[in-house]
């Protein structure tokens, strides 16, 4: 007893709290000191003591112990404030949806993390003995993130696909979740309702496949004698921890020297002591043996495997290392399918490091070294390419900050920054463990209206005529509000753009008749000339004539040219020609002539080559019902069962009309009803109804057939397909394409019915109501043949077609709707399917670089006989005419001004032509008896309007003309309540309201003309008009849009606001919300300026969507979009989180070698590149062998790295060698590429690499093959044992094939023996199988080699001689390529 007491007196007494780490240290010291048995005894006593104390203190988790962090309230409030600002910015069009998502996720992630860091100090200060605090921070129970969910906030969750849900859960579990939050948290939580069962089965299946692939791999030899090796070096970005993990338990493949000293020899296994020496001496590089280097793929040797994981010694012979490997990869999957909390989806929150300002002061840097960009949150920033030195000058001291390259600078030069303000963000390199993946995000329109791009848009080359467009630069997409008018009464071609229509009358009168008797006083035409005798600036001729009369030409209304100048036209001039028109007096009275030629002359009168001059709607191609048009070059494809199903390849599409060279097209009728979303439908989707069935309360069906109901956001599309329904049997292979046309006379084989012949074409459409079941709808088709020449002389005057010298007119048929596009009919009207057009062309060679012509309507009166002409001028190049011609007609000012007189509206400006370098403008005056005012139109569409006080001179930047203006105050012109005649502009007191041609950007098609390489430009014009009721109207030949006043905003500004604001607003300009235009405050709504009046603007409201470069725009310019249509698709890179929810599918994806993400795609490309290069260097036989081997080595290493990355990010340690054994099986096959020796392998056969090598040597000729990655499922079905294949999957098929081929199973693996009940060749069963080959192992290596393969000696020498000679360069290129494309280390991580 005394001795014990004396010993105790010597011991040191520690008095401190012991937590997990201290406990670990204590135990390891006890083991070192006392050994295992005694330590366990001591620990038992500690445990008992702990239990006694815990019982006495009665520590338990009570709900009152969960104390919410006090700062949570304002933190959450702050985050909400930030996301509100973000939402506003998104609404104004400053950030797009992806940036908004990213930023909101980072805001909430930061809030959540901050709360988490607050937690511990908060507990420590307020309640240090709190049981929650004691338990979680001592490591006894619970960790920080779990407690954080109890007392902080749960934060962001990811959905089952691993995408973040950007609605954070703000409450914690102590406060309780709202219903929404509960449902969201079920997605993300560990024990999620949605989660566990599915994931567990996934992981189990993964394990099963893994074991299946590698079950036959057993340690059969001590040394296979391989010369291959893999280098590991601690340099390139490997952490020391990973370096140690990679090396420990491996076997060296080469001696390692430090200077002259050899510190380790070949075939020595590496322990921790040796590794420490490597690290201290920085030995470079270390060559090791791995399962990759082992010479056989069906077994493995002890030295290539290394130490056994169980008892740090070399692995025993007969150990089933394959099964161990498969299970050690699969098993963590079962544990890890459960989710981690916050790390889902998108955020790269932790990865960006910030540089903060050291003190207050002014920041300065060299602006030439940076250029502006957007951050990934859509904030403006500067990107620096090289190191940037930033100085911050405070009052007393100057701080220097060095910012590394590729960083973002978030402040401007000379800006005042406060201390600790973030001034730059450093992009982290590839050292982070994040997979990048490319994600598509679709943005849907939330309102209906017309699409508008604010930039030129590239057409992707393969979609030149389609509707997929790539954005070259950041810009806005605008959706201009306005809905299509679905009126059943008005035929579409009566109203032309700019017409004023009394909307109410449309629904009342059955016929729409315009009163032509009202003379049109308001239309004034200006004629410009540049008079050589006049001043340099060019005079303006005011031209006042009697009332113009309106000429009705077939269906369109145009103001006629005043007759005073008819004599000019009678003479034909060079480069100009006249088209006389058939002209009836009767037609003037009857506006709605049934069919007739309609001319299409744009209001600005400029026609380009190949533009349409006139068109004729042939009554034969009219349909009264909706339907789908199909046409293309018809190709007959023989599909399974050799039925001639015709499949339609997409034809090139022109927009808005589709020119066709086909001689026939098909129209598939269907009945379409577009109903409001609230309407109650009385039929079910996919049900079959008869004729005259009631669909909704007041609509009955006109045809019987299959009903398809499609719900969009605010409307329901209900289609009825006539025809019959056919349920295919097992044998009928119906093509999975969306629709096929079957020609008449084809016999449809069906087991149940007798043979059946179709008389007409039919359209077959496959409809899949559920995943398993599908049926086929067979619909009748109307076939239209297109006649080649429609009898022209009857349509167009004869002499016109004979003038060949200066113009060519071609007759072209256009199909109006696109291939496969639905044409929507409007009840009680007809749809025109084909339009015959007269296309204007002229000989490019004769006229030189003629780009465009000017066309106008002319009326010539001779002896009281009136005829109408279209006058067409050829304009040489837009600039060459300025001031040269001297006739009262000519294009006096440049064509950018008005060179023709066909504009209906007096105020108008043409689009900018790309060839103008100098913006010029024109001034036009209007003289009337009552008042006078001035408008300046310039090529940039800017204008200033208004009375100028005290006869001031008004100078404008764009115009060289100085004009003086006097305004007489007169009595206001009364506004009539009825509609004014066509083209009239409503007058108000003292100012003009004018509507104006709004020009859109020109879209450049990258199609060259045939004759010379002029870019072919097509201009898109839109016109809008306002009438007295505030309605705005825009029509196309095919659709009407009416705007209600609710879509517009009116502003009443000060009378003389032009003096107060320097900003001029141009017509057609887009204004974003919240922009300060005038001084009285920000602009309320975003939109496009339609009408500028003296003290008010009319703005058509529009919604901007921001799109960044590379985004894909769906839909055409000016197309009508409904709510819920796809607008843009963004492709953005997202960090794959290490979350195992994505991790497990990820591992599986790598093991099944599915090339889903971009990495494995370029892996395959690189593989091919390698094969070619190596073959070029080495000649064919060695090229294939070495090429395949290098390829395989490269892909092995990258696969191992990818799999390890997922597990390491979860903190799961799996030894590389397990993964390597599996990966070795994936890469052990090659594909025979061409039959060098037809009697050995057939091309396309999968054979083992070693077998290919050996056969090549034995035959003394090259077998051509290439490396291939085989997924684990495929590898399990491509083994040497058909019994193991059959027990895995597809039993009947595998056994039948094996029987037919007469395969022999040598029963080498475990599974075959288990199935047949033999002894398993591992462990003790291994010895008997092996002992007869013992003496073989004692033969010296050289003799054995020579006996086994005669050519082996020379072969080996040549091969490895080569390998050494360009081994160095291979390794170098390896390192480079693998680093570039994977962001992995070199060969190291393996």
Curated annotation (Swiss-Prot):
Q: Which GO terms describe its molecular function?
A: DNA binding; DNA-directed RNA polymerase activity; zinc ion binding
Q: Which family does it belong to?
A: Belongs to the RNA polymerase beta' chain family. RpoC2 subfamily.
State the top-level EC class: transferase
Biological function: DNA-dependent RNA polymerase catalyzes the transcription of DNA into RNA using the four ribonucleoside triphosphates as substrates.
Q: Give the multimer and partner information.
A: In plastids the minimal PEP RNA polymerase catalytic core is composed of four subunits: alpha, beta, beta', and beta''. When a (nuclear-encoded) sigma factor is associated with the core the holoenzyme is formed, which can initiate transcription.
The places in or outside the cell where this protein is found are:
Plastid, Chloroplast
Record-listed E.C. numbers: 2.7.7.6
The cofactor remark states: Binds 1 Zn(2+) ion per subunit.
Cross-referenced SUPFAM superfamilies: beta and beta-prime subunits of DNA dependent RNA-polymerase
Q: Which GO terms describe its cellular component?
A: chloroplast; DNA-directed RNA polymerase complex; mitochondrion
User: Superkingdom of this entry's organism?
Assistant: Eukaryota
Looking at the UniProt entry, the stretches that span the membrane are none
Q: Where does this chain mainly localize?
A: plastid
Query: What is this protein called in UniProt?
Result: DNA-directed RNA polymerase subunit beta''
Q: Which NCBIfam families match?
A: rpoC2_cyan
Q: Does the keyword Coiled coil apply?
A: no
Q: What cofactor is this protein dependent on? A: Zn(2+)
Gene3D superfamilies from the UniProt entry: 1.10.132.30, 1.10.150.390, 1.10.1790.20, RNA polymerase Rpb1, domain 3
Signal sequence coordinates: none
Q: What does it catalyze?
A: RNA(n) + a ribonucleoside 5'-triphosphate = RNA(n+1) + diphosphate
The protein's matches in HAMAP family, at most eight in alphabetical order, are given as: RNApol_bact_RpoC2
Give one GO biological process term.
Answer: DNA-templated transcription
Q: In which residues is Zn(2+) bound?
A: 224, 294, 301, 304
Q: Tell me the keywords, alphabetical order.
A: Chloroplast, DNA-directed RNA polymerase, Metal-binding, Nucleotidyltransferase, Plastid, Transcription, Transferase, Zinc
